[in-house]
Regions:
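Short helices/loops that flank or line small-molecule/ion binding pockets
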Residues: 15-16, 36-37, 49-72, 76
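Periplasmic-binding protein-like
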Residues: 1-5, 71, 75-115, 133
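Short hydrophobic/aromatic-enriched beta-strand-loop microsegments
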Residues: 41-48, 81-85
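Short helix-initiation/N-cap motifs at beta->coil->alpha
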Residues: 9-10, 26-29, 43-57, 68
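Extended ligand-binding regions for polar small-molecule ligands
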Residues: 11, 20-21, 26-28, 95-133
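A conserved helix-loop-strand patch within extracytoplasmic ligand-binding domains
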Residues: 1-32, 39-42, 104
Length: 133
């Protein structure tokens, strides 16, 4: 998880998030994390871009979101926002996985498909389409 704040924000620690308004996408880890911070007003959104737009427009103080979309939004809103690794706030690292039965013959095929998606630009195009809109 990453925290996105306004470029001029003084938020740098977990204590700085207390009693703030924090945006997150509905049903995500960011939503659950924000609900656990003391005094926070949690604002949820159907789309992450809406949370970040509200941040840029001063309606929320921070957005808690996954690393990849945070990096996309940092580029999209360059100079208006900054991103901070959630480890600075005590958030645990979260990874993605595809679960398969042990010894599955699909492992090599799935790994190759993922490599191909990255190599031919499909992965980046999907990120831009669904995260960076």
């Amino acid at each position: 998880q990453y925290v996105i704040v306004a470029a001029d924000s003084d938020v740098t620690t977990a204590d700085d998030l207390k009693n703030k308004t924090i945006g997150s996408q509905l049903g995500t880890t960011g939503m659950f994390l924000s609900e656990d911070i003391e005094g926070v007003t949690a604002q949820t959104y159907n789309r992450a871009i809406d949370a970040v737009n509200d941040l840029v427009n001063g309606r929320v103080d921070a957005v808690i979101i996954d690393k990849n979309p945070a990096e996309v939004f940092n580029t999209k809103f360059e100079g208006k926002v900054k991103i901070i690794d959630g480890a600075e706030f005590g958030f645990e690292t979260e990874e993605y996985a595809i679960a398969l039965p042990k010894g599955s013959e699909l492992v090599d095929q799935i790994n190759q498909a993922l490599e191909d998606l990255k190599a031919d630009g499909t992965f980046d195009a999907l990120v831009a389409q669904y995260i960076g809109e």
